[in-house]
Structures are given as C-alpha cells and as structure tokens.
C-alpha cells in the first residue's frame, strides 16, 4: 500500500476508534467516520467495503497485534499470556470500545480464533490430567473462550487489574486441566 493510502487508512481507523469510544456502533455512519478522518467517501470505499468491513479489519488488527511474535518463548505459559495481555493493554482504548459496543461479538470471535490457533501450537497433543480425556477441539475452544472472558472482564474493569495478576489468575483457572 502506498504512503498516501496508508495515511488515509490510519486516519479512518483512528477516527472510527474515537467514534466507537463516544457512541454505539449502530449509530455511527460512514459519513461520521469520513468527517472525523477528513477523507472523502471515495477514499473510504477505496479502502473498505463498508462500516462492517472497517470493524472487521480493526478487530483483526488488534487480534494480530495481540499475538505479535517478538521472540516471546512459547514454552512458558505465564510469559506468553503476559505478552498477549501487554499487547492488548497497548490498544486498550480500542479494546474497551469493542468489548463494550456492538463490535463485541466480532471482537470475541476473532480473539477466540486467534487464541485457539496459538493454543493449537502450544498445547501438547496428548496432555496430562483431565485435558487428556477431552477432545482436542473442545479443549482448545475452552482455553480460548476462557481467555476471551478474561479479556472482557479486564476491559469491563477498565484494565485496572495488574497484567501479571490477571495472567496468573487465568492460568490458575486453566492449569488444573493439565494436572
């Protein structure tokens, strides 16, 4: 993408994120977004198919950023969870707006799929404990759904809880499955 398009895309995403913090998704129009971003309608539609497409891309960007690979070791669950929480915390304004608004379902689904993918890479194929008696698909879904619930709880409480404590609490809820 050329620099001009990237600048317009960034302005649209920033404007949309601001609007999501101010009002419900269903009340936001493409007109509101382009007015806030200072771009034309043709520019918007050259980059996004619709407001829903913009929402999906925003959510995807946040989910992708959450799992950015910075060399964090995948063999230490605490380090891995803290890394993801730190990346979500960096985008907490957008996450809070998505969790609280009409985009919450899209955000939850995207994050669940992203975490399931990561869990599939890190959870042993034949885990110990009760997890070993579960179907793999169910186990991965449970781990990811619990993670999404934790992120929602954290956002609903304005990210006030310490990331390390949230990570420890999440793992305390999940680890008994593997003992």
Regions found by a protein language model. Give the residues of each.
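Conserved acidic
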Residues: 4, 8, 103, 107, ...
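Secondary-structure edge/capping motif, primarily at the C-terminal ends of alpha-helices
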Residues: 69-70, 95-98, 123-126, 154, ...
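Amphipathic alpha-helical segments that line or abut small-molecule/effector binding pockets
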Residues: 75-93, 141, 149, 164, ...
């Amino acid at each position: 993408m050329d620099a001009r398009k990237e600048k317009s895309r960034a302005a649209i995403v920033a404007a949309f994120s601001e609007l999501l913090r101010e009002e419900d998704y269903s009340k936001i129009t493409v007109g509101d977004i382009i007015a806030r971003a200072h771009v034309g309608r043709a520019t918007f539609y050259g980059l996004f198919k619709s407001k829903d497409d913009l929402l999906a891309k925003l959510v995807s960007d946040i989910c992708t950023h959450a799992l950015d690979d910075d060399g964090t070791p995948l063999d230490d669950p605490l380090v891995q969870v803290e890394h993801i929480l730190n990346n979500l915390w960096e985008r907490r304004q957008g996450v809070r707006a998505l969790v609280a608004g009409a985009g919450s379902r899209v955000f939850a689904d995207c994050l669940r799929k992203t975490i399931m993918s990561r869990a599939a890479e890190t959870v042993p194929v034949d885990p110990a404990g009760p997890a070993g008696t579960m179907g793999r698909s169910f186990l991965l879904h449970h781990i990811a759904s619990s993670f999404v619930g934790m992120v929602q709880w954290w956002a609903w409480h304005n990210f006030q809880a310490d990331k390390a404590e949230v990570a420890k609490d999440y793992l305390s809820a999940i680890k008994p499955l593997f003992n």
